[in-house]
Amino acid sequence: IGRADLVLIPLQAKQLDGKQAVRAIQLVKRQEKAFRRRIPHSVLLTRTSAAIRSRALRAIVEDLEAAGVKILPVELIERGAFDAFLAYGGTLEALDRKEVAGVDKAIENARAYAAAVIQLLRENEAEAQAAAVAGGQGA
């Protein structure tokens, strides 16, 4: 964690996941102190519903936002294609669309997730470079 460019903390809308996410964030904060550097981190909402947002998830998101925790803007939606991909291996693109429902939506979701992570990494790099320049000007 101490040398990571980005720490993603997966979170389902479950009480136990919420508690574990808090523990993970606390670990990141301890590592920040130990390494004397900011460690970019964000919560990734997983296995969410494409149709509705549960009360539990809304409450968890509100609590995280109130605590200033960054949440990745893309959620990994609960889809059978993700389960099949993990069970059978290979790639999402290789799944048989006749046997597995929602493959195209899962691919779209996975691409949006990847793009969000790349964007966050770029933003973090730009912030780090700006901080380095600002720190160098005071010397």
Language-model regions: role of each:
Residues N109-A139:
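Charged phosphate-binding loop/patch that engages nucleotide di/tri-phosphates or the phosphate backbone
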Residues F85-R111:
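Inter-lobe coupling/hinge region of RecA-like P-loop helicase motors
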Residues A13-Q15, R47-A51, V100:
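Short histidine/acidic/glycine/proline-rich micro-motifs that form metal-
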